């Protein structure tokens, strides 16, 4: 059936309850347990925020009729994660992939602005998973360094990385995970390392997955964004200096998670600098590995939004 007007309402407000109780289809990406229960003929579709490498740390209450995953390999892992049947899991990929694959002129202009301001030629997006969360129960005590960020153990390492990027005309944009407490780099003057939060993107009229599209490479670790980024077929680097600690603390959904990380495996600053040089020089050693992992982790299509709408017979 067709969709009418679109309204924005803040959750847990009276109007939000009204629409939640009367809507036929409810799409969401985070917990929707505040509504209490579904009504007859309602469908709750959890778009979810991503499938990555990390095993489940805390039990989750299933409150959906369907949940999306990028590909069939994640059906088994999410059955265990949510404690649900395979029938509730749809390997359609995420609607936000359309935005990531298409990009936007706004994002391209924002990238040009950042590169010009820093005298840089390429932009590496760094998206670490959270270690110290705003909620203590979610903390991952796997790093013990000054800034609570991988590889950068102290101010000397931070300034070394900044100098190396400046000399090689590379800009690193660190995008904080929304659960991570803010990074504090103190009074260190950084020319080629920029730190962004969601509000910075919003102030420039951007959504995160628009901005991801304009990056020349991605640095991550165990975050699901690395799986998403495979669709762009661009270089990936994985910071793994707390891999052993994370194995003990959280564990993995794959028996050998490193096999599903098709990119530079970085354990120290020298590894990171080598990755930066490869990006500068257009060197890509992992294209075939990315293709192999992408085939296992994604159910690729041309229009992810339309795939979801078609499944539920929704026309617009």
Model regions and ranges:
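Short, small-residue-biased leader/transition segments that mark boundaries at the very start
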Residues: 2-7
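Donor nucleotide-activated moiety binding/catalytic core segment of transferases
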Residues: 11-23, 178-227
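Membrane-proximal helix-turn-helix segments that form the acceptor-binding/catalytic region
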Residues: 15-17, 57-67, 159
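A donor-sugar binding/catalytic signature common to diverse glycosyltransferases
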Residues: 25-51, 203-250
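A short beta-strand/loop micro-motif in the catalytic core of glycosyltransferases
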Residues: 26-27, 65-71, 90, 171-173, ...
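A nucleotide-sugar donor-handling region in carbohydrate enzymes
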Residues: 51-54, 62-149, 178, 285-289
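Catalytic binding pocket for nucleotide-activated donors in carbohydrate/polymer assembly enzymes
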Residues: 189-191, 224-297
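C-terminal alpha-helical cap of glycosyltransferases
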Residues: 301-316
């Amino acid at each position: 059936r067709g969709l009418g007007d679109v309204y924005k309402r803040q959750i847990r407000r009276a109007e939000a309850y009204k629409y939640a109780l009367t809507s036929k289809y409810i799409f969401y990406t985070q917990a929707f347990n505040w509504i209490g229960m579904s009504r007859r003929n309602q469908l709750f579709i959890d778009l979810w925020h991503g499938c990555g490498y990390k095993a489940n740390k805390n039990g989750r209450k299933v409150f959906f009729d369907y949940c999306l995953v990028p590909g069939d390999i994640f059906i088994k892992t999410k059955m265990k994660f949510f404690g649900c049947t395979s029938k509730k899991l749809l390997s359609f990929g995420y609607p936000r992939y359309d935005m990531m694959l298409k990009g936007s002129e706004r994002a391209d202009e924002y990238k040009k602005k950042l590169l010009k301001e820093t005298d840089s030629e390429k932009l590496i997006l760094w998206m670490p998973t959270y270690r110290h969360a705003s909620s203590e129960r979610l903390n991952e005590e796997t790093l013990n360094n000054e800034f609570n960020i991988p590889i950068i153990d102290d101010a000397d390492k931070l300034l070394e990385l900044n100098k190396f990027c400046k000399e090689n005309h590379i800009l690193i944009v660190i995008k904080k995970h929304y659960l991570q407490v803010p990074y504090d780099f103190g009074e260190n003057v950084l020319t080629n390392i920029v730190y962004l939060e969601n509000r910075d993107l919003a102030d420039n009229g951007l959504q995160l997955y628009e901005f991801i599209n304009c990056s020349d490479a991605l640095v991550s670790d165990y975050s699901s964004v690395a799986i998403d980024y495979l669709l762009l077929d661009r270089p990936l680097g994985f910071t793994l200096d707390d891999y052993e600690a994370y194995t003990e603390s959280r564990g993995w959904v794959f028996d050998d998670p490193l096999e599903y990380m098709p990119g530079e495996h970085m354990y120290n600053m020298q590894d990171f600098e080598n990755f930066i040089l490869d990006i500068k020089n257009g060197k890509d050693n992992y294209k075939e590995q990315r293709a192999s992992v992408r085939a296992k982790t994604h159910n690729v299509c041309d229009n992810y939004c339309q795939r979801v709408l078609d499944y539920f017979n929704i026309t617009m």
